[in-house]
Amino acid sequence: RNAGQSSPFLRTFLEILELPERSCSLPAVSGILSSEPVRNRYGLSEDDCRVITAWAKEAGIRTDTGLDSSRSFSRLNSFSYGLERMMLGAVMPSEDPYEEAGGEVLPYSSIEGNGIRAAAMFREFVRTLSQAVSDLRTKRTASGWQSFIGSMVRSLFSTKDYEEDFMLLTEAVGDMAKYSGAAFDLSGKAPGDPLIPLEVLRTFLTDRLGREPSGSAFITGKVCFCTMIPMRSIPFKHIFLVGFSQD
């Protein structure tokens, strides 16, 4: 298995890159929270994550209408409304929390004791993830993506025990920065520092992190970088010559 499949850190990172174009459903979001590097970042255990998911379901959370492109769910089923219910229920000891909340939001009253901290961490995680998903939709230069990804990883992941995976991700983003200098836009103009959309970043990193770790993976991907010597024949339909000098 390649690094992108076997590493919880890299696998979860790639899942986050897909969120801007897919439904931000409760199963998708809770799956990200339950991954070890993310839950460790927020000081949560596996049991905490299971309980949080149960609370979220009971509070009516289904999807985030602010992130999901579909409108099949109302605001009452959004993360923002469900989290408001959860936090109001946690802090209001009144026998009639609905009346105390002004009658606008029905507090979810099953959270108490040590569960209040877990609920607060869940709210912080959802807010951070929501901001990251929104920011991922912005085109950036390669250097801009380097800075953004570093910041996003620090805010959502614990890199403890995953230093090698984080280094692999950093190297992959660095490689994209090197290649982007030779990129051409659709007009045929070669920009010095082109803006790169999320789709290009995601495709590049998925391919880069999905490569086999050994040299035996030659000619197994969609693009192969190699010399033409000592080949007797070149087994490719399309050949692009890069880096030729006058010599």
Predicted feature residues:
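Polyanion-engaging groove/track-forming segments
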Residues: 1-247
